[in-house]
Regions:
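Short arginine-rich
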Residues: 249-256
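Short, well-structured alpha-helical segments that form the helix of a local strand-helix-strand
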Residues: 238-249
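N-terminal mature-domain region immediately after signal-peptide cleavage
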Residues: 1-239
Length: 259
C-alpha cells in the first residue's frame, strides 16, 4: 500500500487516498482499492482517530461495568456469543476489517486480538440493542418530497442517536469509498468502522438504519451495518437493496430506510 505522508496536522495523503479536515471541521476520507487495500489504507490514514474511538468506547464500557470480575465475565460472554459471527460476514469485509485491524491500539489485548476486537465492535451496536433494547440506539429519520421540498425532489434527513458519550460523537468521518468491485459510495462513519449507518452510492441510492424492538438473539449473526454496507456497494435499485437484505441473517430488528 502507498505510504502515508503528513502534509499538516489535518491533511494526510497515501497515493491517491487522503484524509483531511474540511472548512466545517469535519474529517473527509477518500480511499480506493480492493478490500484488503481499502482496510489497510483506511487504517493507516485514520489510525489516530481509530485508536481514539476504541479507547473512548472501551472506557465507556468500563464506566458502565466497573467491576473487574464482571468485565471478565462480559469478555467471556462476548467471546462465546460472537463465536459464529465470522460465518455471517462476507469474506471481502473480513479482509477489510483485517486490514483495518493492523492499525488498532495495542492497549486492549485482554479484550481480544485486534482483528477479533474489531469484528466484535462491528456487532456492538446490535448486541447493545438486543441486550437492553437500548434506546441508546433509537435513531430517527424522515423523508419528504413533492410540495414539501423546494424543488419537489426527495429529501431524507436523519438523527444518528447511537449514544456512546459526547467524546465518541466528536470525530465523525465522511468517507468516500471507491471499491474495486461494486458502486462507489459515501457514508458518515468514525475511525475503525467499515460498516454503514448512513450513506449514499453513486447510483443515488441512500440507506440509513433505525432500531426496532428485538427479541434477545441466542448467537451473533450479521451486524446490521455490514448489511447496509453491502446494499450501498452492490444495489442500484430499491428492489436490489431488498434482495440483499433478505439474503442475510441479522440478529436484531432494524428498519433499513432505503431511498
Amino acid at each position: 500500500i502507498p505510504e502515508k505522508v503528513k502534509i499538516n496536522d489535518s491533511t494526510f495523503v497515501a497515493g491517491d487516498n487522503f484524509l483531511l479536515k474540511n472548512k466545517q471541521g469535519q474529517w473527509e476520507l477518500y480511499v480506493e482499492g480492493n478490500p484488503l487495500q481499502i482496510g489497510k489504507i483506511t487504517g493507516s490514514l485514520t489510525q489516530e482517530l481509530m485508536q481514539k474511538q476504541e479507547a473512548i468506547f472501551f472506557n465507556k464500557v468500563e464506566d458502565l461495568v466497573p467491576s473487574k470480575t464482571q468485565q471478565y465475565l462480559l469478555r467471556k460472554f462476548l467471546a462465546w456469543y460472537n463465536r459464529k459471527i465470522y460465518l455471517h460476514i462476507p469474506e471481502e469485509y473480513k479482509a477489510e476489517i483485517y486490514g483495518l485491524s493492523q492499525f488498532s491500539s495495542s492497549n486492549f489485548s485482554e479484550i481480544g486480538e485486534p482483528y477479533l476486537r474489531l469484528l466484535y465492535l462491528h456487532g456492538a451496536h446490535d448486541i447493545g440493542h438486543a441486550m437492553q433494547d437500548l434506546m441508546l440506539v433509537g435513531c430517527s429519520s424522515f423523508a419528504v418530497w413533492g410540495d414539501k421540498t423546494e424543488d419537489g425532489e426527495l429529501l431524507i434527513g436523519r438523527n444518528f442517536d447511537f449514544y456512546a458519550g459526547d467524546d465518541f460523537a466528536k470525530e465523525k468521518i465522511i468517507a468516500f469509498v471507491n471499491p474495486s468491485e461494486g458502486h462507489k459510495f459515501m457514508s458518515v462513519t468514525w475511525g475503525g468502522m467499515m460498516g454503514v449507518v448512513s450513506g449514499m452510492n453513486d447510483q443515488g441510492l441512500t440507506v440509513t438504519i433505525n432500531a426496532g424492538k428485538s427479541e434477545i438473539p441466542l448467537v451473533a449473526k450479521t451486524p446490521i451495518s455490514i448489511v447496509t454496507r453491502e446494499i450501498l456497494q452492490y444495489a442500484s435499485t430499491i428492489e436490489e437493496a431488498v434482495a440483499i437484505a433478505k439474503k442475510r441473517e441479522v440478529f436484531v430488528s432494524e428498519a433499513i430506510f432505503v431511498g
